[in-house]
């Protein structure tokens, strides 16, 4: 999965997919009442990027729905996964469940079209703080109470805080999560970070009793780092330059081993080599 980073304006969906992304990451900020409000990152952000592009969250969802609904004039067949980077650090811990409930309602109405031929992309809810795990339970409860528990088949989870892998496993247990786990590791492109924790995550993914289904690394903008991440065995790479990742995947060393994921590749299944 080539994951376009910080895609917060509707116009950027086309831009990143046309550069080679089959997945995008979108920032979601919340108001004081735990309503998802804007797709917005703010300052500071990655080096070389504009930090301030934004939409109202529900409007972004409508644009995203068009981009992922077959038959729509804006449809992109290859856009198959969306990571919502949930900026919950502005909330109190006890608001996490409410944030999950409100997020589920927004997605149900504006993205899934109340279960009636909505957008088809898989969704990863990425949460920065382990203490906010109740966002997941609130989300799940709401889709169930609104009569659409089947949509949970399209939803996965990630904690983005670079926490100890054992602590993340315990938190999923508390949240009742037993699959659909995308584990991320990384740092802003302005800084360097080694691949030690990525290798630990890959080892967990590939062990018989691991909880991780997919591992992705962020933020990768250079060819050399892309090769290092692929050599470490990641499933996804988040980038500001999807075309760079696509170029490396076309190199003879990687062409035989990797391919771009399509809609038929289940993002919740651990790939067995």
Curated annotation (Swiss-Prot):
Cofactor binding note of this UniProt entry: Binds 1 Mg(2+) ion per subunit.
Active site: 5, 41
Cellular component terms per the entry's GO annotation: extracellular region
EC primary class: lyase
Keywords for this protein: Cytolysis, Dermonecrotic toxin, Disulfide bond, Glycoprotein, Hemolysis, Lipid degradation, Lipid metabolism, Lyase, Magnesium, Metal-binding, Secreted, Toxin
Cofactor(s), names only, from the UniProt record: Mg(2+)
EC number(s) stated in the UniProt entry for this protein: 4.6.1.-
Superkingdom to which the source organism belongs: Eukaryota
Main location: secreted
Residue pairs linked by disulfide bridges in the UniProt entry: 45-51, 47-190
Glycosylation, residue list: 250
Residues noted as binding Mg(2+) in the record, renumbered to the chain: 25, 27, 85
Gene3D superfamilies: Phosphatidylinositol (PI) phosphodiesterase
Catalytic activity, reaction form: an N-(acyl)-sphingosylphosphocholine = an N-(acyl)-sphingosyl-1,3-cyclic phosphate + choline; an N-(acyl)-sphingosylphosphoethanolamine = an N-(acyl)-sphingosyl-1,3-cyclic phosphate + ethanolamine; a 1-acyl-sn-glycero-3-phosphocholine = a 1-acyl-sn-glycero-2,3-cyclic phosphate + choline; a 1-acyl-sn-glycero-3-phosphoethanolamine = a 1-acyl-sn-glycero-2,3-cyclic phosphate + ethanolamine
MF terms in GO: lyase activity; metal ion binding; phosphoric diester hydrolase activity; toxin activity
GO biological process, one term: killing of cells of another organism
Tissue expression pattern: Expressed by the venom gland.
Protein localization: Secreted
Task of the protein: Dermonecrotic toxins cleave the phosphodiester linkage between the phosphate and headgroup of certain phospholipids (sphingolipid and lysolipid substrates), forming an alcohol (often choline) and a cyclic phosphate. This toxin acts on sphingomyelin (SM). It may also act on ceramide phosphoethanolamine (CPE), lysophosphatidylcholine (LPC) and lysophosphatidylethanolamine (LPE), but not on lysophosphatidylserine (LPS), and lysophosphatidylglycerol (LPG). It acts by transphosphatidylation, releasing exclusively cyclic phosphate products as second products.
Family: Belongs to the arthropod phospholipase D family. Class II subfamily.
Name under which the protein is recorded: Dermonecrotic toxin LdSicTox-alphaIB1aiv
Taxonomic source organism: Loxosceles deserta (Desert recluse spider)
Organismal lineage: Eukaryota, Metazoa, Ecdysozoa, Arthropoda, Chelicerata
């Amino acid at each position: 999965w080539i994951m376009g980073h910080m895609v917060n304006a509707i116009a950027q969906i086309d831009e990143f997919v046309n550069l080679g992304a089959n997945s995008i990451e979108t920032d979601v900020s919340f108001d004081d009442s735990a309503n998802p409000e804007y797709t917005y990152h703010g300052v500071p952000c990655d080096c070389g990027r504009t930090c301030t592009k934004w939409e109202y969250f529900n409007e972004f969802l409508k644009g995203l729905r068009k981009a992922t609904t077959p038959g729509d004039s804006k449809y992109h067949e290859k856009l198959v996964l969306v990571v919502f980077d949930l900026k919950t650090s502005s909330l109190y811990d006890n608001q996490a469940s409410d944030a999950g409930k409100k997020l589920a309602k927004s997605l149900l109405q504006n993205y899934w079209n109340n279960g009636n031929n909505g957008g088809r992309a898989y969704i990863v809810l990425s949460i920065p703080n382990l203490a906010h795990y109740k966002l997941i339970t609130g989300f799940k409860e709401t889709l169930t109470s609104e009569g659409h528990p089947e949509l949970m088949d399209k939803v996965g989870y990630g904690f983005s805080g670079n926490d100890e892998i054992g602590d993340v496993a315990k938190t999923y247990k508390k949240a009742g999560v037993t699959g659909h786990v995308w584990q991320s590791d990384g740092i802003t492109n302005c800084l360097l970070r080694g691949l030690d924790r990525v290798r630990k995550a890959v080892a967990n993914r590939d062990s018989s009793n691991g909880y991780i289904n997919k591992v992705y690394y962020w933020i990768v903008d250079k060819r050399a780092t892309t090769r290092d991440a692929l050599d470490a065995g990641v499933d996804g790479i988040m980038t500001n330059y999807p075309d760079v990742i696509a170029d490396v995947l076309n190199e003879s060393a990687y062409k035989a081993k990797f391919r771009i994921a399509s809609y038929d590749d289940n993002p919740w299944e651990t790939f067995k080599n």
